[in-house]
């Protein structure tokens, strides 16, 4: 599914150009021409990223970011400021308010797309990654599919995230606490033993292709994902 990007820009030529570039690069742009219409676009399906102009009819980009951060459902949506205000003080103010990056007009389409992808990699690594393959096991971050050879494997979303982390960090030992921080996040409280439950579920899901052996217990330390049995 294409990543949904909300383009908040009051100048129609710039907004249309940005939307065209996004479409050409596989994104799904959604347009907003002023502050109020941007707020009205904050509903399901939520945007994966927001391109936000500094100055808007009805309010400022800074005010819009503050609105995002007040709401639990929108506070984690990444924001790239798209504006003619290039002074250092303005850039710092935007970043300190909560913007994830800053691009100054005029800009090239290549730079715009590169910055969007860079922010998405930092915020949500699975959003832009290619298919990951190891020992006949493949994981597609975009379609959320896992295959053992040609056979699809069924697993829950937490097991998928756990497998994704393991496949991108193979041959390393991680404690339960480290896995909780990397997979569940630091703002979620769950017990260490929750990791054990999902490890068991992940192994069960990987059994059909014999890949359950890749999820290894390191006694007294934690878990490792390895091709060395």
Swiss-Prot record:
Keywords: Activator, Cytoplasm, DNA-binding, Phosphate transport, Phosphoprotein, Transcription, Transcription regulation, Transport, Two-component regulatory system. InterPro entries: CheY-like_superfamily, OmpR/PhoB-type_DNA-bd, Sig_transdc_resp-reg_PhoB, Sig_transdc_resp-reg_receiver, WalR-like, WH-like_DNA-bd_sf. The keyword Transcription applies. It comes from the Bacteria. Residues 129-227 bind DNA. GO terms for cellular component: cytosol; protein-DNA complex. This is Phosphate regulon transcriptional regulatory protein PhoB. It comes from Shigella flexneri. The lineage of its organism: Bacteria, Pseudomonadati, Pseudomonadota, Gammaproteobacteria, Enterobacterales. The gene is phoB.
């Amino acid at each position: 599914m294409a990543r949904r990007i909300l383009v908040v820009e009051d100048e129609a030529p710039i907004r249309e150009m940005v939307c065209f570039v996004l479409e050409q690069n596989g994104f799904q742009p959604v347009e907003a021409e002023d502050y109020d219409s941007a707020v009205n676009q904050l509903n399901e399906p939520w945007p994966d990223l927001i391109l936000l102009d500094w100055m808007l009819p009805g309010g400022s980009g800074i005010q819009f970011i503050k609105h995002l951060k007040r709401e639990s459902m929108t506070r984690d949506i990444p924001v790239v400021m798209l504006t003619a205000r290039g002074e250092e003080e303005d850039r710092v103010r935007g970043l300190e308010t909560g913007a994830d990056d800053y691009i100054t007009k005029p800009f090239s389409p290549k730079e715009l797309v590169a910055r969007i992808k860079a922010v998405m990699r930092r915020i949500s690594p699975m959003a832009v990654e290619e298919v990951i393959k190891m020992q006949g096991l493949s994981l597609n971050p975009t379609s959320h599919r896992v295959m053992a050879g040609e056979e699809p494997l069924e697993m829950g979303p937490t097991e998928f995230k756990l497998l994704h982390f393991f496949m991108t960090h193979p041959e390393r030992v991680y404690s339960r606490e480290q896995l909780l921080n990397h997979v569940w996040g630091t703002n979620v409280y769950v017990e260490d033993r929750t990791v054990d439950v999902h490890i068991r579920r992940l192994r069960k899901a990987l059994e059909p292709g014999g890949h359950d052996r890749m999820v290894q217990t390191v006694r007294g330390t934690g878990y490792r994902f390895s091709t060395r049995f």
